[in-house]
Curated annotation (Swiss-Prot):
The record marks A98, G99 as: Cleavage. GO terms for biological process: DNA repair; DNA replication; negative regulation of DNA-templated transcription; proteolysis; SOS response. The active site is at S133, K170. One of its GO terms (cellular component) is protein-DNA complex. Pfam families: LexA_DNA_bind, Peptidase_S24. Residues 27-47 bind DNA. Belongs to the peptidase S24 family. GO terms for molecular function: DNA-binding transcription repressor activity; sequence-specific DNA binding; serine-type endopeptidase activity. Represses a number of genes involved in the response to DNA damage (SOS response), including recA and lexA. In the presence of single-stranded DNA, RecA interacts with LexA causing an autocatalytic cleavage which disrupts the DNA-binding part of LexA, leading to derepression of the SOS regulon and eventually DNA repair. This is LexA repressor 2.
């Protein structure tokens, strides 16, 4: 039985977690990593992996996934494998405010594995949104937004910006003699960047992942 791209990515995640942490991910962690709405989708893919002989599951254990067949041999004696270009493993770097700017927190909290097709352009990392000032763009509190790292942006693009060591996501507006960061929620006021402020574009918004809540 052939595996889908998602199932291959799940198998890679299982092997990686066993290698790095010594234990496989739980079904809940797999669902969260791939943005599934619930664990039933994770169960479906795990059943397919088991039927294909790639894993076996120990009944009654929350982390009862075991590698089997070729996957187990590959872990014991890893072979050189081509890098897949359709799957991304992205670090989650703290939080970004979609509201008032909050202090930057760039420590890597977690990694998420997902298909590249969710984003354009390709992101370099994810940030967790706090606040609802970008609500009318469909960006909500708790979303994970993809960020393409760049210092260049055009007026009208949604950017992740740094203002005096604080990070925020807003709509960039560049005027003749001023720069403003606009919310997409009428309950919030625009942020005008003052000449004496330390301001920089950290990246472009390029899509989002909505974790199951």
């Amino acid at each position: 039985m052939g595996l889908t791209d998602t199932q291959q990515a799940i198998l890679a995640l299982i092997a990686e977690r066993i290698e790095t942490d010594g234990v496989p991910p739980s079904q809940t962690e797999i669902a969260r990593a791939f943005g599934f709405k619930g664990v039933r989708a994770a169960q479906y893919h795990l059943e397919a992996l088991e039927q294909a002989g790639a894993i076996r599951r120990v009944p009654g254990q929350a982390r009862g996934i075991r590698l089997a067949g070729a996957a187990a041999h590959a872990r014991a004696a890893p072979a050189e494998e081509p890098v897949r270009d359709d799957v991304l493993r992205l670090p989650v770097l703290g939080r970004v405010a979609a509201g008032l700017p909050i202090g930057a927190d760039i420590g890597s909290d977690d990694f998420v594995v997902l298909d590249r097709v969710f984003f354009s352009p390709s992101p370099d990392y994810l940030l967790k949104v706090q606040g609802d000032s970008m609500r009318d763009e469909g960006i909500f509190n708790g979303d994970l937004i993809g960020v393409h790292r760049t210092r260049d942006a055009r007026s009208g693009q949604i950017v992740v910006a740094r203002i005096d060591e604080e990070i925020t996501v807003k709509l960039l507006k560049i005027g003749k003699d001023r720069i403003r960061l606009l919310p997409r929620n009428p309950d919030y006021a625009p942020i005008e960047v003052l000449p004496d402020q330390d301001f920089a574009i950290e990246g472009l918004y390029c899509g989002l992942l909505r974790p199951n809540r």
